[in-house]
Amino acid sequence: MNGIYALQQTFVKFSLLALYHRLFWVNRHFVRSVWLVGIVQGCWGIAILLVHIFLCTPMEKIWTPWMVEGTCVDVNTLFAIYEALNSVLDFIVAGLAIWMLPSLQIRKSTRWHLAGLFVLGAFSGFIGIIKIVEAYDSAQRNFQAVIWNVVQMSISIICCCAPIYRSILPKMGMSSIPSWASWSLRGSSRRSKAVASTADGTSKFSMRSYQGEGKAGGTSVSGNWINLDGSSQRALAWVDAESHGKDQSTYQDIPMGRMKVERSVEVI
């Protein structure tokens, strides 16, 4: 269990550090800190894994300590050392995120939500301290250590998966956010109602068109711009439609009584 725990804690912190590097790579001092913490964490994970593999000499004594003579590492001392270092690394990783959080150009409410998640990551470090204190209670040491390991690993996974929560969970205290499904699929089904066919085979757009000049994202636009009211994002689209009402020479494969409409919509 402890060998798996060391690997899990190492890769969880690697994922968080990789996210930090991707977000704040322009800050050289911060990037150096990320690399330093990553190297220390990697050395910690490898060392703990090797120590648990070669915990006793000979190795058979790990599985049958009452049958094989040999020596083993003091488990309590080892536990206190690697849990203390792991807690310090938890606090450092959470502190790095909170340090750079004010530089993000996001809403204040979102900043508070992210800060709460990072504080939850720091709580993983406090769990490590609790494990050290209770490790010397030999009566329930093994049972409680397993429980605290599971709790600590679960909290770590919750924190490292934080970037995807916005797309799969509703906003806390706010209206529900769109589903993870593509908004363009929903928008296209709504925009399809904008095309109405007439008896002579021509097509008309019932959506509002921007005639003249307007602005979209700070740039001036003109022409047949339409507002994508059905979408979950503010955007304008240029619509270029052609109708083929009586030209039967080009579209001989269209059955009688039906009409073929071609549309090209470019979203910017």
Curated annotation (Swiss-Prot):
The keyword Electron transport does not apply. Its main location: membrane. The chain crosses the membrane at residues 34-54, 78-98, 113-133, 145-165. One of its GO terms (cellular component) is membrane. It is found in: Membrane. The keyword Cell membrane does not apply. It is a multi-pass membrane protein. Pathway: Mycotoxin biosynthesis. InterPro entries: Rhodopsin_dom_fungi, SAT4-like. It comes from the Eukaryota. Keywords: Membrane, Transmembrane, Transmembrane helix. Trichothecenes are sesquiterpenoid toxins that act by inhibiting protein biosynthesis. Part of the satratoxin SC1 cluster involved in the biosynthesis of satratoxins, trichothecene mycotoxins that are associated with human food poisonings. Satratoxins are suggested to be made by products of multiple gene clusters (SC1, SC2 and SC3) that encode 21 proteins in all, including polyketide synthases, acetyltransferases, and other enzymes expected to modify the trichothecene skeleton. SC1 encodes 10 proteins, SAT1 to SAT10. PANTHER family: INTEGRAL MEMBRANE PROTEIN-RELATED (PTHR33048:SF47), PTH11-LIKE INTEGRAL MEMBRANE PROTEIN (AFU_ORTHOLOGUE AFUA_5G11245) (PTHR33048). Belongs to the SAT4 family. This is Satratoxin biosynthesis SC1 cluster protein 4.
